[in-house]
Amino acid sequence: MGSDWDEIKRLAADFQKAQLTSTLQKLSERNCVEIVTLLLEKQMLEVVFTNDGKEYITPDHLEREIQDELYVNGGRANLVEVSKTLNVDLSRIEVLAERIAAENPSVHLVLGQLIDEDYISHIAQEINEKLVLRGEISISELASQFDLPSDFLQHDVVEKHLGKIIKGRQDAANPRVFFTQAYIQRCKAKIRGALAAITRPINVAVILQQIGVQEKIFHSLLDEIAPAGQVTSKLANSQYVPHIYAKTQADWVNSFYKQNSFLEYDAIQKLGISDAKSYIRKQFPNEEFLFLKRVALGARLVELTVVTALNECSATKQYLDLTTILPSNLSEEDIEEVFSTIMAQKHSNPSNFVYLDSIVFSQPYLAQLVQPCQALAESQAKAAIDGGVYQQYIVEKTLAQKGNASTQELEDDGKVDKRDERRKKASSGKAGGGAQGRETKTKSTKKHQRGKAAAHNDSDDEDDVQQGSRGGGGVNKKAVKPLELVKTADIVKLITASLEEEGLEHLSKPIAALYTNQFNQTALARAQELFEATPQTNRRQTHAAIQDRINTLLIDIRLYEKGLKLFPQDTQTQLVKYLLKSLGNDICNELSLYVAGECNLTVKNTNLNVDQRNKLAQECEAQYRAALLEQNKALNKSIDEFELATETVLKACSMIIKKVDKKKDRLLIADHKKKLQKQLLECQDPALLLHLAALILFTAISGSILHASGKFVSAILQHIRGSLNEEQNALLLRYHDLVLQVLQATPDSSESKMANEHLQAMQAQVVELAQNFSRASVSKAD
């Protein structure tokens, strides 16, 4: 029974063993691949394939292998190298590396590298050894050495282990620099020793070069050392000035100022102080200074000496020599600057003084000095009235004002149509052949007429040529020279004797110049009073002046008429119209204004047109009215009719027409030609030059003068053509064509520039022809 039970137990054990025992069956490679693929498809398994695809590994195992690589490489592993070693794609390595760094605080991912704390501790020990050896180290040097980011080195390596592994301190001024205490002490000792040996100002750069200390360390340790001196600045060219030297400077400046109450900038700069003004302000913070260009004056010197003396000068009505109260080494420029500054600061009233050559005159003193000049002004005014000088000045001034006003009005009225008119002239001139039908647009010359006041510019064209007055003058508007009744020399004679007594005769001319205008105006005002007090005398003199003026204009018209009669009838008609519109209009204005004065009529505008003159004539007395109206109508008729109408007006005004003196005609024509030649020599404008040359040649050939505007140049050239040889005609024709080309082209065009160059080249020939032409030379050449 017992044996059976034992058998049963044995069988039960064998059965249990059979149940627990599994059969091992080896699968083929293909079956394994299919099983893994099936697991991957059902996402029951995650693996990472190698780069060649022959192997795969789970992420957890790959992570352990990455950590193993980090350990094998001493705590610093480059992910690129790990990827090559493990034969796994870099992106998989980077993902796992980020997970490792995130899960493990002791591991850092820096620029594609895994770094653990063991490696950080290792490089901290290296940094400490280097710091002990050199005494100073910077983050930039460490970044270059370890090939790590500077921020990582500073925050996670150096600052983290500073005071533990790394024995040193951080620079407060530059946190990226670290020192050892021993290095700081050595630098302090060097700086302290060098500064203690210095007795004069020296550049900081020289000190640093000698002791071998960096500039930034020098400036950071300087305050801790508390040297016996100071550094001027922290810039490159700063200097160290020892206190002993600064004390010597200050003692000298204080002593000089105490004795003289002023300081010279040059003297301070010689002490080695570059900015003298700033040094003075710093050295004397409680003192007030008057800073000039070369010196600084103390307030005590200015207030107690100069201002007090000026006030006394004003009170006593005398003068003050500033050189006697100011330091002797001040120049005249310095003294003048002192006076100007005091006046600007209103220490005294500027209107009470006059400064001349270091001398300050009070106004009462000068007023008393020039008092005799009042009598001089009175006598000069009376002499000007008695001699008729002032009356002549009034006439010239009135005529000039009328002429200028006329020119301005005509210029304003003609602005609208000038451009179109110029285009028409240019196109019409271009259409003609040779000199036939050519019209040259030129600038105006002056009307050549005798008399002291030049007539106003005519209104025929903005560019018409007006022949210059035989009395002189240029192309511009006439300006009457101011009348000088009292001259500087007259005042000098009166005040020199008084100034010689004071030794100030060298200032007589400057003082006289100050009062010349004042006394001249006084004399003119007095002359005006005397002039207005004798209306009959003034009227007679004005009557005589206008009578001479009208006779001069009539003689001019007669001479111009002879010249224009040499032209064909159609051109002659245009020249007559132009002559009456210019000179005839002047005669009408002169007589209308004179009659208005005789009738006590007020005329606001002295430059009258035909309608204004007719209206003025209607307001005049009956004895003048008809004659003036007829004269205005005659402006549109012939020259003879105009002269007859003018004679009627002159008779009504009790004026005499001078007899014709034909003996003087040749002299007048010769004088007229000389004035044209003078204008020609001074002329640079090609169009005006051609116009003047044509007028001169016409006078030389015909023996007559001509009053013509620029549009008649073509007609003049055609008229004189027969008296010139072929070469001369060709020269004038070519010059005329070039002038038209310049006027028609735009100013900056190549065509205009080329034409101007040709004109410049031909200018001398044209001038030579006009200046030296004579009929005899032409006949000889022919």
Curated annotation (Swiss-Prot):
InterPro entries with a match to the protein in the record: Ufl1, Ufl1-like_C, Ufl1_dom, Ufl1_N
GO BP field: protein K69-linked ufmylation; regulation of proteasomal ubiquitin-dependent protein catabolic process; response to endoplasmic reticulum stress
EC number per UniProt: 2.3.2.-
Basic residues bias: start-end ranges: 443-453
GO cellular component, one term: endoplasmic reticulum membrane
GO molecular-function term, one example from the UniProt record: UFM1 ligase activity
Record keywords, A-Z: Transferase, Ubl conjugation pathway
Disordered: region residues: 404-477
Family classification: Belongs to the UFL1 family.
Cited function: E3 UFM1-protein ligase that mediates ufmylation of target proteins.
Name of the protein this chain belongs to: E3 UFM1-protein ligase 1 homolog
Source species of the chain: Drosophila erecta
